[in-house]
């Protein structure tokens, strides 16, 4: 089992920023279109984080043209070019799934004042 752990440690990204649930983030994703590759940004609120180590994932939710869109990203994926924390959020829950039923102002997360 030590060989598996060693390979997993080798694959971990070193430059992952410290972000938590409720933060508003911009995730830069590498998208392959035909024979060229470009970077596409996905901005939204982090509503969940799961797992640890190489299998750690987080869910980002945004509203696009009045429709809620959620994407699950592996933190250490080579497809994720970068994660930027735009705004820190102040929440008291580990999972913000209740935001799925909220619309408008009630779906906002308070900003953490540091």
UniProtKB/Swiss-Prot annotation:
UniProt keyword Ribosomal protein, yes or no: yes
Keywords, ordered alphabetically: Ribonucleoprotein, Ribosomal protein
SUPFAM superfamilies reported for this sequence: Translation proteins SH3-like domain (SSF50104)
GO cellular component: cytosolic large ribosomal subunit
Coiled coil: none
InterPro entries xrefs: Ribosomal_bL19 (IPR001857), Ribosomal_bL19_CS (IPR018257), Ribosomal_bL19_sf (IPR038657), Translation_prot_SH3-like_sf (IPR008991)
GO molecular function: structural constituent of ribosome
Tagged with keyword NADP: no
Similarity remark: Belongs to the bacterial ribosomal protein bL19 family.
NCBIfam families: rplS_bact
PANTHER family for the chain: LARGE RIBOSOMAL SUBUNIT PROTEIN BL19M, RIBOSOMAL PROTEIN L19
Function: This protein is located at the 30S-50S ribosomal subunit interface and may play a role in the structure and function of the aminoacyl-tRNA binding site.
Protein name, as recorded: Large ribosomal subunit protein bL19
Annotated organism of origin: Acetivibrio thermocellus (strain ATCC 27405 / DSM 1237 / JCM 9322 / NBRC 103400 / NCIMB 10682 / NRRL B-4536 / VPI 7372) (Clostridium thermocellum)
Lineage per the UniProt record: Bacteria, Bacillati, Bacillota, Clostridia, Eubacteriales
Gene name as annotated: rplS
